[in-house]
């Protein structure tokens, strides 16, 4: 359905306008710019989106207390891509209080088997009901043939961390 139809189904009409606020940390000017863009893009008709940029600690407090309509954040997933902290009932990063028993069951099933089928089932379900909307994705990876490099210690922010300590075995590549 269109945005207008979705808003009308939610009771947002010209006679019942709604203002929502996007919470964002003011410490990241890029994220504030994104929030401003989303505000301008999504506002219209009966819907107004405002931006509330807060200092980092106030931002975290507002998230933890649920004092927001929408928020712009960043999550770095663990190596196993477990999204439980975001979408599991009571998850550490589930600031919106999303609770869905079927989602929890699908997460458990996926984490126990990690098959392509359970992943597809989980992601199809989340595509229809997820309380989050990913707007960007980035990965930092180092892929090498087994045994090519000794001493490889990449970090999330620096895939080439400790490069001076690497031993490259060209005969194994």
Predicted segments with their positions:
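Extracytoplasmic/peripheral linker and loop segments enriched in polar/acidic and small residues
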Residues: 48-59, 84-148, 172-173
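Append "and occasionally in soluble cytosolic enzymes with long acidic Gly/Pro-rich linkers
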Residues: 1-40, 121, 171-172
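Paired acidic/hydrophobic, glycine-rich loop segments that form the ligand-binding mouth/hinge
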Residues: 69-74, 134
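Long beta-strand-rich cores associated with HINT superfamily self-processing modules
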Residues: 145-173
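Structural motif
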Residues: 24-27, 74-76, 138-139
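Beta->alpha turn/N-cap motifs
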Residues: 56, 73-78
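Short helices/loops that flank or line small-molecule/ion binding pockets
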Residues: 33-45, 57-68
